[in-house]
Amino acid sequence: MSEITAAMVKELREKTGAGMMDCKKALAETNGDMEAAIDWLRAKGIAKADKKSGRTAAEGLIGVSSEGTKAVVVEVNSETDFVARNDAFQDLVRGIAKVAVSTNGSVEAVAAATYPASGKSVSDTIKDAIATIGENMNLRRSVALSVEDGVVATYIHNAVSDGLGKLGVLVALKSTGDKEALNAIGRQVAMHIAATAPLAIRPEEVDAAVAERERNVFIEQSRASGKPDNIIEKMVEGRMRKFFEEVALLSQAFVINPDLTVAAAVKEAEKAVGAPIEVAGMARLLLGEGVEKEETDFAAEVAAAVKG
């Protein structure tokens, strides 16, 4: 059996809100597998779905830029928030986002593209910035969306400067209608995506592995009721329908008007746009998502320094 450390228990508690002893038991029952331990706690009714903790330990900025019917969102990381607030760093991220619009949006393509202000590649420009600012930084993620006819709306939540912040969203809308009205509903949908973090646009587009994991948890929860298998099957199907409604963009309650689903709000907007609207794509980047900084034990660090 894998050793269950205090750090593992702490991480599981932060992800699930479950008690320390429950977390320790869950890890022991699942041989230290964090994801399996989360499912074990959920199946026992002790914890809700893992929200990926919401912790954004990495510093830096998210930048968005658009040109015509194409837009990009990029994430550039730094070591400290102090550097993220630096004008030179902000100009760099804004510049990288503008360069990214002319590429296919992949990190590799953006890194290899020429940065106009330096005449060098984006990758080499970042290296120069590291030497100048004195702190490590990197282009971590980049996503591009485009449509042949329509708009790609952008949104930065709590912007620190024009096109820069810690959470950026793109939403691609296909339509032959009025572009100004289309961009207005696009921005509202982008704000909704920022708030709700949907997993997919439509229920059938939710990752099959994610859906199967939820189904297995619901089966275990339903079995605990002691009801017959045919009733359990109906219970699971009902819970899966609710799950898809909660994680698929178009079936979610629209945050700006909860009386409507997002699909209904988009349909309503077709009146102002003057043509049908299709939600063709979305991207949501939260700064530091999936990255954890190594936590420093300050007392241990001082003790080590004193010992030389």
Swiss-Prot record:
InterPro entries linked: EF-Ts_dimer_sf, Transl_elong_EFTs/EF1B, Transl_elong_EFTs/EF1B_dimer, Transl_elong_Ts_CS, UBA-like_sf
CDD domains in alphabetical order: UBA_EF-Ts (cd14275)
Coiled-coil segments: none
Region (Involved in Mg(2+) ion dislocation from EF-Tu): 80-83
Locations listed in the record: Cytoplasm
UniProt keyword terms in alphabetical order: Cytoplasm, Elongation factor, Protein biosynthesis
GO molecular function ontology, one term from the record: translation elongation factor activity
Pfam families: EF_TS (PF00889)
GO cellular component: cytoplasm
NCBIfam families according to UniProt: tsf
Similarity-based family: Belongs to the EF-Ts family.
Role: Associates with the EF-Tu.GDP complex and induces the exchange of GDP to GTP. It remains bound to the aminoacyl-tRNA.EF-Tu.GTP complex up to the GTP hydrolysis stage on the ribosome.
PANTHER family found in the cross-reference section: ELONGATION FACTOR TS, ELONGATION FACTOR TS, MITOCHONDRIAL
Protein name, per record: Elongation factor Ts
Species in which this protein is naturally found: Rhizobium etli (strain CIAT 652)
